[in-house]
Amino acid sequence: MENLNIDMLYIAAAIMMGLSAIGAAVGIGILGSKFLEGAARQPDLVPLLRTQFFIVMGLVDAIPMITVGLSLYVMFAVV
């Protein structure tokens, strides 16, 4: 029974990492498409849009990194 709980923790950690990576990829894709759409509509605002794009992209990309840390905690410290 103990072995089953450890296996479930590993599966939970894998699901956490996978879903966060998929969510971040979708978010960055949508963010990039909206950036290109905004740059095409108003080319004079490209420097401002680019700055905001990279700030938000960094925040979106931080979510999978935090999830990797949490999943490693679940795998190694919870048991």
Curated annotation (Swiss-Prot):
Main location: membrane
Keywords linked to the UniProt accession: ATP synthesis, Cell inner membrane, Cell membrane, CF(0), Hydrogen ion transport, Ion transport, Lipid-binding, Membrane, Transmembrane, Transmembrane helix, Transport
InterPro entries, per the entry: ATP_synth_csu_bac/chlpt (IPR005953), ATP_synth_F0_csu (IPR000454), ATP_synth_F0_csu_DDCD_BS (IPR020537), ATP_synth_F0_csu_sf (IPR038662), ATPase_proteolipid_c-like_dom (IPR002379), F/V-ATP_Csub_sf (IPR035921)
UniProt keyword Transmembrane, yes or no: yes
Any one Pfam family match given in the protein's UniProt record, by short name: ATP-synt_C
Entry membrane topology: Multi-pass membrane protein
GO molecular function: lipid binding; proton-transporting ATP synthase activity, rotational mechanism
Segments traversing the membrane: 11-31, 53-73
PROSITE patterns, A to Z: ATPASE_C
Gene Ontology cellular component list: plasma membrane; proton-transporting ATP synthase complex; proton-transporting two-sector ATPase complex, proton-transporting domain
Protein task: F(1)F(0) ATP synthase produces ATP from ADP in the presence of a proton or sodium gradient. F-type ATPases consist of two structural domains, F(1) containing the extramembraneous catalytic core and F(0) containing the membrane proton channel, linked together by a central stalk and a peripheral stalk. During catalysis, ATP synthesis in the catalytic domain of F(1) is coupled via a rotary mechanism of the central stalk subunits to proton translocation. Key component of the F(0) channel; it plays a direct role in translocation across the membrane. A homomeric c-ring of between 10-14 subunits forms the central stalk rotor element with the F(1) delta and epsilon subunits.
Similarity section: Belongs to the ATPase C chain family.
Protein name: ATP synthase subunit c
Organism: Blochmanniella floridana
